Amino acid sequence: MAQSSTQQRGRTPLMRQYYKIKERHPKAILLFRMGDFYESFDDDAKTVSRLLGITLTERNNGDADDVPMAGFPHHALDSHLPKLIRSGLRVAICEQVEDADDSSGKVVDRDVVEVVTPGVSFHDQLLNPKQSNFLAALHFGTGRDKDRIGFSFIDATTGEFSVTEAGLDQLQDLIQTVAPSEVIVDKRKTERLQQHLREVPFTVTEQEDWVFKYDFAYQTLLEHFETHSLKGFGVDDMDLGVVASGAALHYLGETQKGALPHVRKIKRYSKDEHIALDPETKRNLELVQSIQDDGHEGTLVSILDETETPMGGRRLRAWLVRPLRDVGRIRHRLDAVEACVDDRTLRDDLREELNQMGDLERLAGKVATGRAAPGDLIAIKHTLRRLPNVLGLLTDADSDALGAIEDDLRSCPEMVDRIQSALVDDPPAKISEGGLIRDGYSEELDELRTIAQEGKDWVANLETEESERTDIPSLKVGFNKVFGYYIEVTNTHADKVPEDYIRKQTLVDSERYVTPELKEMEEKILTAEEKIETLEQELFNELRSQIAQQTGILQENAELLAHLDCFAGLAEVAEQHDYTRPSVDDGLTIDIEEGRHPVVEQTLPPGDPFIPNDMALDPDDEQVLIITGPNMAGKSVALRQVGLIVLLAQVGSFVPAEAAQIGVVDRIFTRVGASDNLAAGESTFLVEMNEAANILNNATARSLILFDEVGRGTSTFDGLSIAWAIVEYLHERPEVAARTLFATHYHELNAMADRLERVHNYRIQVSEHEGEIVFLRKLIPGGADHSYGIEVAKMAGLPDAVIARAREVLQNLESQHLEVGADEADGAPSEDPPSEDPPSGDGVRAKKGEADAVPDLEDSQANQMHLFGQPDPAAEEIKEMLGEIDPNRITPVEALMKLAEMKETLAD
């Protein structure tokens, strides 16, 4: 807030200083260091008081009005800061940068030393050890690039810095994959950002438009990397990406108030290197977040994460949301995992060594930015000390993949020796506490310590000597920060006090004195201790700077150890859960024998074994598998487990199956279940159609599609028609002939297997005995012809009266209204009892391969159930509309418009 000169003159010098600093950080909560407290004022104080639950008071402001104030002790910063940041706030930490004793009566100099934001923080209390904390920058293109974006993301704690360019329609995918905590954007484009995202699960920070100018961004990057061009990083042709990257780096520098030497390179992030996973797929497969509560339990990462280090855990999460497409890289990872699976001793020994290591990746960032405390350097020492053992294990391993890590890993004995010789084994948490430098490291420091210790020994002896000399048995020698050293005598012995004692302080029951000799020794001790503190600070800073010069080596070691941790962890999972190595190639065949769902099999009750299933997909014969069966029988699990097995294989992990051949996929699509997006005004059906349209418009012949209950969000005929048309579309269009699993409750779709040569029917096996059903969860060839809806309702606990009445109504409807003729194989339910044998399909009129043949909707409609009398006349009009539709020509948009027209007809 701008302050007039009149306002400034009316305030106290301290408050004038506060407002001057606050003007530079108007959008941040300013925590203003005053002695042992952090204080906040005005609106900041009200916010701090409300969020932290601390008292709101007032502070005198000279001739101006008193101002609201709220504060807390400086040592409570670590507990209060997370609450402020997790509320989406920016916090500017203002410290005293001058010793109060040196201020000569004027206001102590203060300055902001750090701005903490959701996306930029080095505070351990704000960070999840096994999750990256990304700051992202988004730049919208203009002109011919109006439908493109530049997107950059950086983790301040590790120095990881990446950039990409993409179509605007891929923004949601990028956000979901990177999961930034904060996104910076041109303040003029905030609304546009919100328009293109269904939800904004991060803090949006607006920046001035000049931050997003190409020349400024380009120069910012050149100055930081100290280069003449960006060609060496392979990003010089990404104009939009350069702007986003420069904006991100500028913002990071502004918040951290210093150099960022650990940000050593910028990488080109190419979506073509990874499987494309849209937000719906990540959510439906529950890779890192549970559908139920967005938590950790029940996710794929909760089963797979057996890593021993935080950096390994972060790397594993990145692998899961960005699986590889390159067969060579996938096989390299599989080779490394296999080496750890085959050699149990090697795996156990590696994991034991990794378990003793610190988070070298983030420790390197702390050292480089001057934030490392003594304990951080000790953690680096302990980690590096383990490397010779790791190298020895890798040398003995018979694996080229692990040998590649051995070749690049550096043990850094000089760095270990330097830290060992300089720091005590268990240093204090803060440098100011002293006693962190080891004896013998500095001759000057040793001399000062000797002086201080001899002085303290003299003081300790003084108490005994003076007690004997004065015959005062209760005489004590003490020290406090205000009066220094003193001799304390109780009032009982006041008459024995010698004349050379000088009274210093009077207490209720005693008096405190000093002597010339004691004051002289006090000055000697305090001078030595002051010099010790200063020298220890200098020595530690020098040591930290020396280690910082090796930041690059630390980061490279951290990356290699993170990979090794992932390999050993994935091997441990494979051993524990009986996974097998998949065969991965560039073909288009997916063939899984005895596959299992990696999460569900671990969460079943004891004694309830998971039933494995085979699954084979290929573009020449079994391109589309239609899976029918009752609700609760396991259709959705079967679909998801195929998606997860394929994903795990391309991560480079072993898979839960007896055997698996995986032809790499470029995308995994899922349309699973029914859900509303009410916040965006989208119904269940519209959400379904949006997701289906995304799949049909973006799938390729190398994609994997998992459709579950498409069309459930609308009427039976609408849903059936759309489901039928989607299957035909995928079958008949070579450019989108993706490998597809299509789970459905529309038994009419079984007829498609006789019409389309690459469509096959499968069903979930069900056993019936004396009116009771058992879901066997086994996938077998053939289509189901019974839904078992009433049986499922009974299992769900509906009252017996409701179940009995439902059976009565069903029997009446089947006997009176389902007049099935010679065309019963076209999809109408049969009156015959359910059979385990797959329907033959002999009664289907169209021959296999006749894609133009569609079900006779008029005949099918005539067979439908009319519970409340004759059909509505509006239905006849809708029949005519349907008869005019050519499913092979209508577009998804036209289909939606036609459905809307039909609904209006019914409403009329």
UniProtKB/Swiss-Prot annotation:
GO cellular component term, pick one: cytosol
Keyword Phosphoprotein listed: no
Domain of life from the UniProt record: Bacteria
Record region (Disordered): 822-863
Residues where ATP binds: 629-636
GO molecular function ontology, one term from the record: mismatched DNA binding
GO biological process: mismatch repair
Keywords linked to the UniProt accession: ATP-binding, DNA damage, DNA repair, DNA-binding, Nucleotide-binding
PANTHER family listed in its UniProt record: DNA MISMATCH REPAIR PROTEIN MSH1, MITOCHONDRIAL (PTHR11361:SF34), DNA MISMATCH REPAIR PROTEIN MUTS FAMILY MEMBER (PTHR11361)
Family: Belongs to the DNA mismatch repair MutS family.
Protein task: This protein is involved in the repair of mismatches in DNA. It is possible that it carries out the mismatch recognition step. This protein has a weak ATPase activity.
Annotated protein name in UniProt: DNA mismatch repair protein MutS
Organism: Salinibacter ruber (strain DSM 13855 / M31)
Gene: mutS
